Amino acid sequence: MLGAAGSAAAADINKGGQIYSMHCANCHGGSGIPMMPGSPNFQRSEKLFQTDAMLLASIRRGKNAMPAYAGLLRDQEIMDVIAYLRTMQR
């Protein structure tokens, strides 16, 4: 679960952006506007109103076409991505 660094506040936004570019942008779009039907628009997404823990669990398990990232990314890397996603909100 979440450790001492288990919040987006303790996360590294720059690393999150790098990870997002490598693993997420092809479907979710480089600026958060989705490229794949069914992907949330992170610039205007109610998905980002969820807690960090809820988003972490969602990314770990995946959904529909999105793969599960448990085992592919460490929890801290996912938290870095969550922190980066929160910068996309307008």
Positions of the model-derived regions?
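Extracytoplasmic electron-transfer domains, predominantly the class I c-type cytochrome c fold
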Residues: 37, 41-90
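Periplasmic/extracellular electron-transfer cofactor-ligation site
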Residues: 11-40, 63-65, 87-90
